[in-house]
């Protein structure tokens, strides 16, 4: 690795750093060496995380080397090198004036980010460096605990108290192993993230939570989320000593909000009422136990849990405190307009004093609350919700966080802290009240509307000052979007002598930024409150987005100021048919409000962008939402970003109003040069920082490029542009004519695509960083799990290790068809029918501890894990099947799933949601009229979707088949092939047939065609240990001479190699290198797991976009194993709407042969040798390979059709995506 010397420190960097990276590392060293704070902004994609890690760890090593050199020189006492000065030994600490005399004085590095998933990314970067420090990651019990009983607790605070109870009683064997095993090399040495820590703890049966706390003592660098540092209670809980440490806040644009929220609270009537209910329960139990003269079983000495060490009088006093607090809050008079009242921060002490909560009593109250919560931890029941009591305990700690000696309301420190707070009391909008309590202790406020007590901190500097008071050596805040840096430093209220606004590492031809003040019709674009919902503005914005989507290739991101604005805009565009036109250009994916469905939505977007022949996709998101931060939209996933307005906070929100008033007051008190922003400046910056976060999605690395559209006339003002990041400002251009925007953007992308290298194909998609995303979305290969995508040999077949005896042909692709004819273990039973498949897919959940990639939207109903296959290669037996209807049901299930795949590919996200809801309603109500009314608008308007409507016929309930036929003819002009017997339920059709005597006719055991029957010699071959195929060739003209079901599998011989090579050559020409790679990966996966669903999903996405690719789908049958042939042919027919060539299903000429029971007993008979059997079998297979069905000719064949490469996915005349 290159070694760079900066400020006298040698830094090992994984590659030669760019100039901006060297400047960044120099500023970091300046903070560390001079013991000062720094604010460092460096755009996303410039490698700031790597620079931070390498620089800080190199500086620590430099200090350690200096101490070592000084100690050696002192011991030598100048005898060895009398002429050399002491400073020449690298006494860096002495030279810098640092009083670091021993190794334990070397500062620890505390690296904080917003979420653990972001920290995992940082740890992965650390593994890529040459540094191997002692590492520790701090997490909560919710993330780290492996005790089954503790993990069952629903809330975090219950886990905490139950854990403490078990630790105190030494009843947790995981905790008991911590001291013994914490020094083991496997646990102490490697760089472990949260997942690794849990896996190692489970393996060694040691508690990961307490193990991480042990490792913290000796760690060189400690990783933790923000709140562990900013929240005083969390600092105490994790015993974090900040004295002399270097604290780094990565993604620091969130620090301001986190500082304020960690020191604020909202106490609702529901919190107090639930707390009182819990205390009532404990008081009642203790009273009954006292009246009976013996302890309650829950509190007895024999109970494994320690009893409640509280007197009845103390519990009653605690209840009285809560009632008085509730009464004091309800006694505050509010104005009639429900606007609430605001008091100064010191009012909180007056209010709490009425309930006898003071600095003097807080200790006893907190102990009592803690005892009750810990006593009830682990107990089940509706009356043991201790969340209210826990919240009250946290609130008391926030209010009385300052020591009594310096925190009294009259002291200077207390006054300074209270200036940052406001008390706001307002009506409870949620009306979350418990039932009225009827005892004498019950509050009278329950009959009135409750009030919420809010205690809000408006200065992030309050938390920053607390960190400085703890003795932090240096505080470094860094992010990609801190602009304007000067105002950010003012908000923190502590000095930052070192500041940096780094440029980007990209060139000017890689970024295009334009302000679009007017739409194509000349109407002004504005998201101002009075214009955002006007018809003129919404219509013009919709037309502008549609035109931009035509010229931006691949992925396009559109950010709205808020969810209501996005939803209202979509509603307007759907009503005016603008949304349908956008869908025709690029399908729309909308960011959901809920956390659970976000991963699926973003995975669907990634998959659509990566699909071969796709024109891309559009993702509609919200500023400050999940997609605006932490997601990687690099390369084709995000070639353009559109910001539709300035996302100002809600202007009339009480918290926003009070924040602006507070800032104006502070600025006024400090005079014209006061170190505070004005309220209006802060308000504007909230919008600009959200915009900057959205802009940061487009350029993610050195070779990336993209365009930014600022679609609001207010961006044309100089003050708005001044708030943009420094690396963006030089590229901004304001356009007066919308046509010039389209012209310049089209030219930009033409030049970029010619000059920039094509992005490398990825095995996995960008990771979803952040806690909102439970699992990581993968693309462009959404059809495989993360575990398989990481295996190199899946994507490079030539690297796969061959077992001895496997073919080692020169062409690695020729080995793909080997062993396809072997039978796997049958799959477990699956749900039957379309509705059952839909319901089954919604109920499925991933297995814990296994990496899973969420399927894209087109595959959410597809893949299901099969049982592991048993060893193959054993002798195969003829099995007598007594229930021939089961394979039919399995095929029907496969058709249902694949039909859902096709529908989800063709419909938009909103329309697919409507479709699935209609299915659920039809399943529950059996209302065919409602179903038909829903399906008509979805499938009838577009002729390309008529085949989907007709394909739905097979899943309509029998008594509705005829009606559906009539609806189909009415909507599409074509029927579905209805016959009267289709109206008879399957069960009735499958009833046993009675012979003339009234007895049940014998059930046929085996079905074979006439041609197949001619190949069998029952007297010589069947069950006699001899060849199953007759040595005589099939007669000319016999149907058996053509490939039948299960006969098209090529072997690894020359003919098989040529067939495979020809097929893959045609696939590469038609689908491109990326599509062919996907096909190869799917084929390899099919060979390993025998999951036809997965390979069909990939195949459908690749070969059904264009009719000329249909032959590739049909010719794929050469790789399909025999037991999948019938399902594959039916699927081909369903997907293409054409009969499967050369694979006609069994017709009337088939005759059923009942195998006599005597044939199930084997008798050893002399037979031909193994070589003879092999030769005869191979000759038969070769005859099948020689005679190909029409339409499946290999490379160069006429039936395959010419291979055509897809055109560019953009341009003014871009074609509609899909079929």
Swiss-Prot record:
<comment type="subunit">
    <text>Interacts with TERF1. Interacts (via PIP-box) with PCNA; the interaction is direct and essential for suppressing telomere fragility. Interacts with MMS19; the interaction mediates the association of RTEL1 with the cytosolic iron-sulfur protein assembly (CIA) complex.</text>
</comment>
<comment type="similarity">
    <text>Belongs to the helicase family. RAD3/XPD subfamily.</text>
</comment>
<keyword id="KW-0225">Disease variant</keyword>
<dbReference type="GO" id="GO:0043247">
    <property type="term" value="P:telomere maintenance in response to DNA damage"/>
</dbReference>
<dbReference type="GO" id="GO:0016887">
    <property type="term" value="F:ATP hydrolysis activity"/>
</dbReference>
<dbReference type="InterPro" id="IPR013020">
    <property type="entry name" value="Rad3/Chl1-like"/>
</dbReference>
<keyword id="KW-0539">Nucleus</keyword>
<dbReference type="Pfam" id="PF23109">
    <property type="entry name" value="ARCH_RTEL1"/>
</dbReference>
<dbReference type="InterPro" id="IPR045028">
    <property type="entry name" value="DinG/Rad3-like"/>
</dbReference>
<dbReference type="GO" id="GO:0003678">
    <property type="term" value="F:DNA helicase activity"/>
</dbReference>
<keyword id="KW-0004">4Fe-4S</keyword>
<dbReference type="GO" id="GO:0000781">
    <property type="term" value="C:chromosome, telomeric region"/>
</dbReference>
<dbReference type="GO" id="GO:0000732">
    <property type="term" value="P:DNA strand displacement"/>
</dbReference>
<dbReference type="GO" id="GO:1904506">
    <property type="term" value="P:negative regulation of telomere maintenance in response to DNA damage"/>
</dbReference>
<feature type="short sequence motif" description="DEAH box">
    <location>
        <begin position="250"/>
        <end position="253"/>
    </location>
</feature>
<dbReference type="GO" id="GO:0051539">
    <property type="term" value="F:4 iron, 4 sulfur cluster binding"/>
</dbReference>
<dbReference type="GO" id="GO:0003677">
    <property type="term" value="F:DNA binding"/>
</dbReference>
<dbReference type="GO" id="GO:0090657">
    <property type="term" value="P:telomeric loop disassembly"/>
</dbReference>
<feature type="region of interest" description="Disordered">
    <location>
        <begin position="1132"/>
        <end position="1151"/>
    </location>
</feature>
<dbReference type="InterPro" id="IPR030845">
    <property type="entry name" value="RTEL1"/>
</dbReference>
<keyword id="KW-0234">DNA repair</keyword>
<comment type="function">
    <text>A probable ATP-dependent DNA helicase implicated in telomere-length regulation, DNA repair and the maintenance of genomic stability. Acts as an anti-recombinase to counteract toxic recombination and limit crossover during meiosis. Regulates meiotic recombination and crossover homeostasis by physically dissociating strand invasion events and thereby promotes noncrossover repair by meiotic synthesis dependent strand annealing (SDSA) as well as disassembly of D loop recombination intermediates.</text>
</comment>
<keyword id="KW-0238">DNA-binding</keyword>
<keyword id="KW-0479">Metal-binding</keyword>
<feature type="binding site">
    <location>
        <position position="172"/>
    </location>
    <ligand>
        <name>[4Fe-4S] cluster</name>
    </ligand>
</feature>
<dbReference type="GO" id="GO:0032206">
    <property type="term" value="P:positive regulation of telomere maintenance"/>
</dbReference>
<dbReference type="GO" id="GO:1904355">
    <property type="term" value="P:positive regulation of telomere capping"/>
</dbReference>
<feature type="compositionally biased region" description="Low complexity">
    <location>
        <begin position="1200"/>
        <end position="1219"/>
    </location>
</feature>
<dbReference type="GO" id="GO:1904430">
    <property type="term" value="P:negative regulation of t-circle formation"/>
</dbReference>
<keyword id="KW-0411">Iron-sulfur</keyword>
<dbReference type="GO" id="GO:0045910">
    <property type="term" value="P:negative regulation of DNA recombination"/>
</dbReference>
<dbReference type="GO" id="GO:0010569">
    <property type="term" value="P:regulation of double-strand break repair via homologous recombination"/>
</dbReference>
<keyword id="KW-0408">Iron</keyword>
<dbReference type="InterPro" id="IPR014013">
    <property type="entry name" value="Helic_SF1/SF2_ATP-bd_DinG/Rad3"/>
</dbReference>
<feature type="domain" description="Helicase ATP-binding">
    <location>
        <begin position="7"/>
        <end position="296"/>
    </location>
</feature>
<protein>
    <recommendedName>
        <fullName>Regulator of telomere elongation helicase 1</fullName>
        <ecNumber>5.6.2.-</ecNumber>
    </recommendedName>
</protein>
<dbReference type="GO" id="GO:0016607">
    <property type="term" value="C:nuclear speck"/>
</dbReference>
<feature type="region of interest" description="Disordered">
    <location>
        <begin position="839"/>
        <end position="877"/>
    </location>
</feature>
<keyword id="KW-1011">Dyskeratosis congenita</keyword>
<dbReference type="InterPro" id="IPR049909">
    <property type="entry name" value="HHD_RTEL1"/>
</dbReference>
<feature type="region of interest" description="Disordered">
    <location>
        <begin position="287"/>
        <end position="306"/>
    </location>
</feature>
<feature type="binding site">
    <location>
        <position position="145"/>
    </location>
    <ligand>
        <name>[4Fe-4S] cluster</name>
    </ligand>
</feature>
């Amino acid at each position: 690795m290159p070694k760079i010397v900066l400020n006298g420190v040698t830094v090992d960097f994984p590659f030669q750093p760019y100039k901006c990276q060297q400047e960044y590392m120099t500023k970091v060293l300046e903070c560390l060496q001079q013991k000062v704070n720094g604010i460092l902004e460096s755009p996303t994609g410039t490698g700031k995380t790597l620079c931070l890690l390498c620089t800080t760890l190199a500086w620590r090593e430099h200090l350690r080397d200096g101490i070592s050199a000084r100690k050696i020189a002192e011991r030598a006492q100048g005898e060895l090198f009398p002429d050399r000065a002491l400073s020449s030994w690298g006494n860096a600490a002495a030279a810098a004036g640092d009083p670091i005399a021993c190794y334990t004085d070397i500062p620890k590095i505390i690296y904080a980010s917003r979420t653990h998933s972001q920290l995992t990314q940082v740890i992965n970067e650390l593994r890529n460096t040459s540094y191997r420090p002692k590492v520790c990651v701090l997490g909560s019990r919710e993330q780290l605990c492996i005790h089954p009983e503790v993990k069952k607790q629903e809330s975090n605070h219950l886990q905490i108290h139950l854990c403490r109870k078990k630790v105190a009683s030494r009843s947790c064997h995981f905790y008991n192993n911590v001291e013994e095993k914490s020094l083991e090399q496997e646990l102490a040495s490697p760089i472990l993230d949260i997942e690794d820590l849990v896996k190692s703890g489970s393996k060694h049966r040691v508690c990961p939570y307490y193990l991480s706390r042990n490792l913290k003592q000796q760690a060189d660098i400690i990783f933790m989320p923000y709140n562990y540092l900013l929240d005083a209670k969390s600092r105490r809980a994790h015993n974090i000593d900040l004295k002399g440490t270097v604290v780094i806040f990565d993604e620091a644009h969130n620090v301001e909000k986190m500082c304020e929220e960690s020191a604020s609270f909202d106490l609702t009537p529901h919190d107090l009422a639930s707390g009182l209910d819990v205390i009532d329960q404990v008081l009642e139990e203790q009273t009954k136990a006292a009246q009976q003269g013996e302890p309650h079983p829950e509190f007895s000495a024999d109970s494994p849990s320690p009893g409640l060490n509280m007197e009845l009088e103390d519990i009653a006093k605690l209840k009285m405190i809560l009632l008085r607090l509730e009464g004091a809050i309800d006694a505050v008079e509010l104005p009639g307009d429900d606007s609430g009242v605001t008091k100064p921060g010191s009012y909180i002490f007056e209010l709490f004093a009425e309930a006898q909560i003071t600095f003097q009593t807080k200790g006893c109250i907190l102990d009592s609350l803690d005892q009750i919560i810990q006593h009830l931890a682990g107990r089940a029941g509706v009356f043991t919700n201790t969340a209210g009591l826990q919240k009250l305990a946290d609130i008391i700690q926030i209010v009385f966080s300052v020591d009594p000696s310096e925190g009294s309301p009259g002291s200077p420190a207390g006054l300074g802290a209270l200036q940052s707070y406001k008390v706001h009391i307002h009506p409870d909008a949620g009306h979350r009240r418990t039932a009225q309590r009827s005892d004498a202790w019950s509050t009278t406020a329950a009959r009135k509307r409750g009030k919420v007590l809010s205690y809000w901190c408006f200065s992030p500097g309050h938390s920053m000052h607390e960190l400085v008071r703890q003795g932090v050596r240096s505080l470094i805040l860094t992010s990609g979007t801190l602009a304007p840096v000067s105002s950010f430093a003012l908000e923190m209220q502590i000095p930052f002598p070192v500041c940096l606004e780094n440029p980007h590492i990209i060139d000017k031809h890689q970024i295009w930024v334009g302000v679009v003040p007017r739409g194509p019709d000349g109407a002004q674009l504005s998201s101002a409150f009075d214009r955002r919902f006007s018809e003129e503005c919404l219509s013009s914005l919709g037309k502008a987005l549609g035109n931009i989507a035509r010229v931006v290739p691949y992925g396009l991101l559109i950010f709205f100021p808020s969810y209501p604005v996005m939803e209202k805009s979509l509603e307007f565009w759907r009503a005016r048919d603008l949304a349908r036109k956008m869908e025709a250009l690029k399908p729309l994916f909308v960011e959901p409000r809920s956390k659970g469905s976000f991963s699926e939505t973003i995975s669907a977007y990634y998959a659509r962008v990566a699909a071969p022949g796709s024109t891309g996709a559009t993702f509609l998101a919200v500023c400050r939402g999940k997609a605006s931060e932490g997601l990687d939209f690099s390369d084709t996933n995000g070639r353009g970003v559109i910001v539709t307005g300035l996302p100002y906070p809600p202007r009339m929100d009480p918290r926003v109003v009070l924040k602006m008033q507070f800032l104006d007051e502070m600025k006024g008190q400090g005079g014209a040069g006061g170190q505070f922003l004005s309220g209006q400046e802060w308000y504007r910056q909230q919008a600009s920082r959200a915009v900057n976060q959205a802009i940061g999605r487009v350029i993610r690395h050195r070779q990336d490029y993209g365009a930014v559209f600022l679609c609001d006339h207010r961006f044309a003002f100089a003050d708005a542009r001044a708030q943009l990041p420094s690396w963006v400002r030089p590229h901004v251009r304001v356009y007066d004519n919308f046509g010039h925007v389209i012209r310049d953007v089209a030219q930009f992308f033409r030049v970029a695509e010619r000059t920039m290298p094509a992005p490398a194909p990825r095995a996995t998609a960008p990771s979803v960083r952040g806690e909102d995303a439970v699992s990581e979305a993968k693309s462009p290969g959404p059809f495989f799990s993360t575990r398989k995508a990481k295996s190199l040999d899946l994507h490079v077949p030539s690297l796969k290790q061959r077992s001895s005896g496997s073919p080692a042909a020169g062409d690695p692709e020729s080995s793909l068809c080997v062993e396809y004819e072997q039978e796997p273990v049958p799959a477990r039973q699956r749900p039957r029918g379309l509705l059952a498949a839909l319901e089954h897919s919604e109920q499925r959940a991933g297995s814990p501890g296994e990496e899973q990639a969420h399927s894209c939207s087109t595959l959410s109903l597809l893949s299901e894990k099969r049982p592991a296959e048993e060893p193959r290669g054993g002798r195969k037996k003829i099995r007598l099947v007594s229930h021939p209807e089961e394979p039919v049901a399995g095929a029907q299930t496969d058709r249902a799933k694949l039909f859902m795949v096709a529908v989800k590919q063709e419909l938009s996200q909103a329309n697919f949601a409507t479709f699935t809801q209609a299915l659920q309603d039809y399943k529950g109500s059996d209302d065919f009229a409602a179903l038909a009314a829903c399906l008509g608008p979805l499938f009838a308007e577009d002729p390309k979707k008529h085949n989907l409507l007709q394909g739905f016929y097979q899943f309509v309930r029998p008594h509705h088949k005829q009606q559906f036929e009539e609806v189909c003819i009415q909507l599409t002009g074509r029927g579905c092939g209805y016959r009267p017997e289709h109206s008879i339920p399957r069960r009735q059709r499958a009833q046993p047939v009675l012979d003339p005597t009234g007895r049940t006719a014998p059930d046929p055991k085996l079905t074979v065609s006439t041609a197949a029957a001619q190949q069998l010699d029952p007297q010589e071959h069947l069950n006699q240990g001899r060849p199953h195929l007759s040595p005589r060739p099939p007669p000319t003209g016999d149907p058996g001479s053509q490939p039948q079901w299960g006969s098209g599998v090529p072997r690894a011989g020359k003919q098989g190699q040529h067939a495979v090579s020809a097929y893959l050559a045609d696939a590469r020409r038609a689908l491109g290198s990326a599509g062919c790679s996907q096909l190869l990966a799917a084929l390899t996966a099919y060979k390993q797991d025998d999951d036809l669903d997965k390979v069909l999903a990939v195949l459908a996405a690749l070969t059904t976009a264009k009719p000329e690719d249909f032959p590739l789908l049909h010719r794929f049958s050469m790789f399909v194993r025999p037991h999948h042939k019938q399902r594959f042919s039916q699927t081909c027919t369903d997907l293409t709407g054409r009969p499967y060539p050369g694979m006609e299903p069994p017709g009337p000429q088939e005759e059923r042969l009942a195998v006599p029971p005597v044939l199930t007993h084997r008798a050893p008979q002399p037979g031909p040798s193994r070589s003879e059997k092999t030769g005869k079998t191979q000759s038969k297979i070769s005859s099948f390979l020689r005679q190909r069905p029409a339409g499946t000719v290999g490379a160069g064949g006429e039936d395959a059709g010419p291979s055509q490469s897809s055109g560019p996915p953009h341009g003014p005349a871009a074609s509609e995506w899909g079929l």
